[in-house]
């Protein structure tokens, strides 16, 4: 195939799609250029499904090569290793709008790899990767119901910005990524500076409108490339099996969905499934039916039973009305030795969230393609298997945990103080101890309480809520605070976090087409009512940050010295600073501009370290009297330490008004003596006198 190129203007950027020259053995491959940011995105689809495959094995890997930024990786091996958090998040960002566009019965393995090969540090690779994945899949000839487009939206001075640069995002009130087909929005990921629901919805519709040019260009590319439509055909339904299954189940599933407790409901459904499969075992054997297909169709019955019930009755499987939030229980300060903690329970979803305060040096150093930087606000989300009553793998975080942690972090970012306002590194850890839907939003609520319990001066409390949707033709219901089953069996997962003032984070995943602006508007308004209710429940535990830090949290003292004095504080080979930290038990961070931050759980120790540093950096004044310690005896006099790191010479003639034959007769090393500063010469050498003090000359240093 000859090389095909398509170029178009997208916001301020010139975007070019190329195919037919690179990675020609892949099912589909595209080079995406967005100014100087260049990605190779490939899609490979297996010709057939593996034997016994019962799920769609789609894998998405986004990777940033260090050579893209003209850098060599750090570390011993000097090569890229496991995926970074950013790479994992963008991989999920690509996966989410693509997965629902494949047919339900398609089980062939599909792998998408997006490689950043050149990076303009002001243009991120996320939108280019989404566009490239859509184009590569469209070229691959898979049964992909695309293409999709993608756009990033900023908001400043009341206007939306299409595909803002990283520089523009620094003072933007919004960073929102939206992806979708020509007719439907499928995915939204955003963080915002407490904007209204109307502004957020406007950003979604603006992005969807602008991305149409991407979809049109990809369609033109596939036509010019001569891509053949997929020949895959969905397997025919076994109508006899489905009829037999429906007859065997009868009204049992409808009854099971009336059980309000999650675990009891799950057990009831499992028992029905077991009985039904046993009752049909004879026909499975005689008619050659597949047990896997029988299980799949049982799942379809579950799906329709729950959906039909809520659409007909407007009552949910746990007995709630459509807009009712589950009972909430909140406690702050539940762990005595931590710096801040909270227990947040909403129905059968529960999180213990802990805040830890550290110094600037505790920040995480990120070795990124665009350059190294430090992250001083860390948010970690853990989802152990016991939270859903199961046994499972326990160890490094999975992609889902990284994604949920990032969403929860987005939820509270808008209210966090700057490092200048609160010079601590802050780590928040959310331990999900029970889960039945919306655990990421429980993490938002719990983290808000834990931060306030730790005394972090957040601007306002934050709460989060997950919304759902069930839609059949023109009938639909919007569900507040969804359960796990409602998420799994519904058509939309719509998470909103924010304060009473506005939205701080919005995440949306839609599984069907036909979600109108009106439906999204209703979901946002219903979410606002739920969020305000949750904030009211949270206020029963805490309404504002605590005035005092935990007794176990480090206290920070900040002082400023002239940058030229830094070497005096550090000392030769770090000797001075090491001595201060060892003797006072403090941790000291020195910045290039002369800012010194002293950290200690003990306030008295921090003050002692501060005094030592002030002594070291203070200037020695001629005419002043200091109390010092004899450091060294010489034939011609004695060296006396008058301040940490500052020694002066008392010449033998300045020891006493009487004649001194031998210095050792008058002074010993370690003696404490009062000395007057006679002179500080241009080289910084200090001349001292004991004799002048005895004669009553000079002003004591303490007089300062």
From Swiss-Prot:
Positions bound to Mg(2+): 487, 493
Substrates-to-products reaction catalysed: RNA(n+1) + phosphate = RNA(n) + a ribonucleoside 5'-diphosphate
MF annotations from Gene Ontology: 3'-5'-RNA exonuclease activity; magnesium ion binding; polyribonucleotide nucleotidyltransferase activity; RNA binding
Keyword Transport (UniProt): no
InterPro entries reported for this sequence: ExoRNase_PH_dom1, ExoRNase_PH_dom2, ExoRNase_PH_dom2_sf, KH_dom, KH_dom_type_1, KH_dom_type_1_sf, NA-bd_OB-fold, PNPase
UniProt-listed GO biological process terms: mRNA catabolic process; RNA processing
Subcellular location: Cytoplasm
Listed EC numbers: 2.7.7.8
One term under GO cellular component: cytosol
Superkingdom as given in the UniProt entry: Bacteria
Cofactor(s) of this protein: Mg(2+)
CDD domains (alphabetical): KH-I_PNPase, RNase_PH_PNPase_1, RNase_PH_PNPase_2, S1_PNPase
Pfam families: KH_1, PNPase, RNase_PH, RNase_PH_C, S1
KH domain sequence ranges: 554-613
Annotated keywords: Cytoplasm, Magnesium, Metal-binding, Nucleotidyltransferase, RNA-binding, Transferase
PROSITE patterns: KH_TYPE_1, S1
Predominant location: cytoplasm
SMART domains (UniProt xref): KH, S1
Enzyme class: transferase
Domain S1 motif: 623-691
Protein family (similarity comment): Belongs to the polyribonucleotide nucleotidyltransferase family.
HAMAP family in the cross-refs: PNPase
UniProt cross-references to NCBIfam families, sorted A to Z: polynuc_phos (TIGR03591), PRK11824.1 (NF008805)
Function: Involved in mRNA degradation. Catalyzes the phosphorolysis of single-stranded polyribonucleotides processively in the 3'- to 5'-direction.
Quaternary structure annotation from Swiss-Prot or TrEMBL: Component of the RNA degradosome, which is a multiprotein complex involved in RNA processing and mRNA degradation.
Name of the protein in its database record: Polyribonucleotide nucleotidyltransferase
Origin species: Xanthomonas campestris pv. campestris (strain B100)
Organism lineage string: Bacteria, Pseudomonadati, Pseudomonadota, Gammaproteobacteria, Lysobacterales
């Amino acid at each position: 195939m000859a090389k095909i190129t398509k170029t178009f203007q997208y916001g301020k950027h010139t975007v070019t799609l190329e195919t037919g020259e690179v990675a020609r053995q892949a099912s589909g491959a595209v080079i995406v250029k967005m100014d100087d940011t260049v990605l190779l995105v490939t899609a490979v689809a297996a010709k057939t499904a593996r034997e016994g495959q019962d799920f769609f094995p789609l894998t998405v890997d986004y990777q940033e090569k260090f050579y893209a930024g003209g850098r060599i990786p750090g570390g011993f091996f000097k090569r890229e290793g496991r995926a970074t958090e950013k790479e994992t998040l963008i991989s999920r960002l690509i996966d989410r709008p693509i997965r629902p566009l494949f047919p339900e019965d398609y089980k062939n393995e599909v792998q998408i790899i997006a490689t950043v090969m050149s990076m303009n540090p002001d243009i991120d690779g996320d939108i280019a990767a989404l566009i490239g994945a859509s184009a590569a899949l469209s070229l691959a000839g898979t049964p992909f119901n695309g293409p999709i487009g993608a756009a990033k939206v900023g908001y400043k001075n009341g206007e939306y910005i299409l595909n803002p640069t990283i520089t523009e995002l620094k003072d933007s009130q919004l960073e929102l990524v939206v992806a979708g087909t020509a007719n439907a929005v499928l995915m939204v990921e955003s963080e915002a500076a407490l904007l209204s629901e109307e502004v957020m919805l406007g950003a979604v519709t603006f992005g969807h409108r602008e991305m149409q040019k991407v979809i049109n260009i990809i369609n033109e590319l596939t036509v010019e490339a001569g891509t053949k439509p997929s020949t895959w055909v969905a397997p025919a339904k076994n109508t006899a099996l489905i009829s037999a299954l429906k007859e065997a189940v009868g009204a049992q599933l409808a009854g099971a969905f009336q059980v309000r407790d999650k675990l009891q409901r799950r057990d009831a459904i499992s028992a029905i499934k077991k009985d039904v499969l046993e009752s049909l075992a004879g026909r499975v054997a005689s008619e050659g039916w597949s047990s896997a297909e029988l299980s799949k169709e049982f799942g379809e019955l579950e799906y329709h039973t729950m959906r039909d019930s809520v659409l007909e009755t407007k009552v949910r499987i746990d007995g709630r009305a459509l807009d009712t939030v589950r009972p909430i229980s909140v406690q702050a300060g539940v762990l005595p030795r931590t710096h801040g903690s909270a227990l947040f329970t909403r129905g059968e979803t529960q999180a213990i969230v802990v805040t830890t305060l550290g110094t600037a040096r505790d920040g995480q150093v990120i070795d990124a393609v665009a350059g190294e930087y430090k992250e001083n606000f860390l948010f970690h989300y853990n989802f152990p298997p016991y939270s859903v009553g199961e046994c499972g793998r326990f160890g490094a975080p999975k992609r889902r945990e990284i994604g949920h942690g990032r969403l929860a972090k987005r939820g509270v970012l808008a209210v966090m103080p700057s490092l200048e306002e609160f010079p601590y590194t802050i780590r928040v850890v959310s331990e999900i101890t029970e889960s039945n839907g919306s655990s990421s939003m429980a993490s938002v609520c719990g983290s808000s309480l834990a931060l306030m319990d730790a005394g972090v001066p957040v601007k306002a409390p934050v709460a989060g809520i997950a919304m759902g949707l069930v839609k059949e033709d023109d009938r639909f219901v919007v569900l507040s605070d969804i359960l796990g089953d409602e998420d799994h069996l519904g058509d939309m997962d719509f998470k909103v976090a924010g304060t009473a003032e506005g939205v701080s984070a919005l995440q949306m995943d839609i599984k069907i087409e036909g979600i109108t602006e009106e439906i999204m508007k209703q979901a946002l308004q219903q979410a606002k009512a739920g969020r305000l209710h949750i904030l009211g429940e949270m206020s029963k535990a805490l309404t504002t940050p605590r005035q005092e830090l935990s007794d176990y949290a480090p206290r920070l003292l900040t002082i400023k010295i002239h940058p030229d004095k830094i070497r005096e504080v550090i000392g030769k080979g770090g000797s001075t600073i090491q001595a201060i930290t060892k003797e006072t038990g403090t941790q000291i961070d020195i910045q290039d501009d002369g800012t010194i931050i002293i950290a200690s759980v003990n306030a008295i120790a921090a003050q002692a370290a501060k005094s030592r540093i002030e002594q070291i950096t203070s200037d020695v004044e001629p005419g002043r009297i200091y109390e010092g310690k004899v450091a060294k005896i010489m034939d011609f006099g004695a060296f006396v330490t008058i301040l940490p790191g500052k020694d002066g010479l008392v010449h033998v003639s300045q020891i006493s008004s009487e004649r001194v034959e031998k210095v050792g007769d008058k002074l010993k090393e370690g003696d404490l003596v009062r000395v007057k500063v006679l002179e500080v010469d241009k080289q910084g050498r200090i001349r001292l006198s004991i004799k002048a003090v005895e004669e009553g000359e000079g002003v004591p240093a303490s007089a300062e």
